[in-house]
Design a protein with these regions (language model features):
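ABC ATP-binding cassette signature C-motif
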Residues: 1-203
């Protein structure tokens, strides 16, 4: 915990593939990937159009999918006109889990991340499709950082970021208390945030 592992290497050496294997997006050709049960892994999404139909603030909170699912299920239960005793029991269970996950702070935490990355408050309730390409990148980065994940996988996180956003990200990662694995061509950035660095060569 508290370590940041930087991965460098030539284009095509397998850096991004390695992260996809760690995240479970790709199967390893040999060996196994083991993550401690209960630990949450968060990945910087590379598909900039995946959340185009979603509200910006919701997109960030989706970084903790379980928390987002609880919020949606709670809303659906409370919106029912024929609220039953079973609904009340289920709502109580969800409220307990929601509180344990600091759900009441979710929107303010998401907004703090967005503001840190210079996404204006007026954009927080717009659809992702209304944002520019660079704004989308920042929202997806905030999504990856949201909710204090146990393991954070970042593939070229400084791409398309302005200098202020890069400096903010550096400070965030330096103070991050869990495990980070980051691929970047920005050696200065890696030197700032990483406790360890590995150079991947061609197999």
């Amino acid at each position: 915990e508290g370590n940041c592992y930087g991965i460098i290497g030539a284009n095509g050496a397998g850096k991004s593939t390695f992260l996809k294997i760690l995240s479970g997006e790709l199967e390893p050709t040999q060996g196994d990937i083991s993550i401690t049960p209960g630990q949450r892994l968060s990945v910087l999404e590379q598909d900039h159009f995946k959340y185009d139909d979603c509200i910006v603030l919701d997109t960030v909170i989706m970084g903790n999918q379980r928390l987002y699912d609880i919020m949606k299920e709670k809303d659906a239960i409370y919106a029912k006109e024929d609220f039953t005793e079973e609904d009340g029991i289920r709502a109580s269970e969800l409220e307990g889990e929601f509180a344990t996950m600091n759900g009441w702070e979710a929107e303010s935490d998401a907004a703090t991340l967005l503001n840190g990355l210079n996404i204006d408050t007026e954009l927080h309730y717009k659809k992702m499709s209304e944002l520019s390409g660079s704004e989308k990148v920042k929202v997806l980065l905030a999504r990856a950082l949201f909710g204090n994940p146990d393991i954070l996988l970042l593939d070229e996180p400084t791409n398309h970021l302005d200098l202020d956003a890069i400096r903010w990200l550096e400070e965030f990662l330096i103070n991050f208390e869990n495990t980070i694995i980051v691929v970047s061509h920005d050696r200065y950035f890696l030197n700032k945030v990483c406790t360890h660095t590995v150079d991947i060569d061609y197999a």
